[in-house]
Amino acid sequence: PAGDAERLRYAINYGADAVYCGLPEFGMRSAPANFTPEQLTESVIYAHARGRKVYLTMNTLPTNEEADRLPEAIKEAAKAGVDAFIVADLGVLDACKTFAPDIDVHLSTQTGITNWAAARAAYKMGAKRVVLAREMTLQDIAILRDKTPPELEIEAFVHGAMCMSVSGRCLLSNYMAGRDANRGQCAQPCRWKYYLSEETRPGQLYEIGENENGSYILNANDMCTAPFIDLICKAGVDSLKIEGRAKTFYYVASVTAAYRKALDAYLADPANDNFEL
């Protein structure tokens, strides 16, 4: 993940084969975690000089007005030399194919692909890769891989935050804080501290868990799959994705390095059934 040019360099220097990032519009992250067009061009040059790739996120669900601005944004990104667009909306997919036909298109996890039929349909529509819904099990992934064309690349998230809703399709932030999660502005109310109250006992708040500060009753545990990266690879995953474009340099460097080490350990002896980090 790369929230800016410096974090992109950290990701590459600590072992990433490819980096994903976004422009100020269409990228599912608020302003501080995006690139200017000039930074994107410079970063693509930096990555390509080191044999790495840059994928541009365009995975919001655009309004009618935003859709009018898609062609220019796509052509600008193509001029910068990005290696693929990551999209969630069918209109964006079509626009990418129309205005940058030579650049690969990946379907974002926001698309909510949870089965082989959806993945196969994505391939027929021109997707080079699908980023699977984070809710899929290893068995689900293996079945999907077995029933889809081998040319279709499979990508899965292996580390980072998990949304309480299926693949981020959540309106809680919009409802409670007026901040649209589908515009990269999630306030993460699922991580706030909540108490239980009973309507006939106003003012009496009950802890749901054992934590004296309240209990996190909505959010899922964060994802960490490094200890069983071998099982993910054996299920048929081609690309491992780390969440965190808005995270710190330290996070990008340390997590990228950890998964680089885990993946290299597996690839050094993929036939070993007793994989350990």
Protein language model features and the residues they cover:
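Active-site pocket-lining/capping segments in soluble small-molecule metabolic enzymes
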Residues: P1-I113, V131, Q139-S239, A246-L277
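Long, charged N-terminal interaction/targeting segments
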Residues: T98, R120-A121
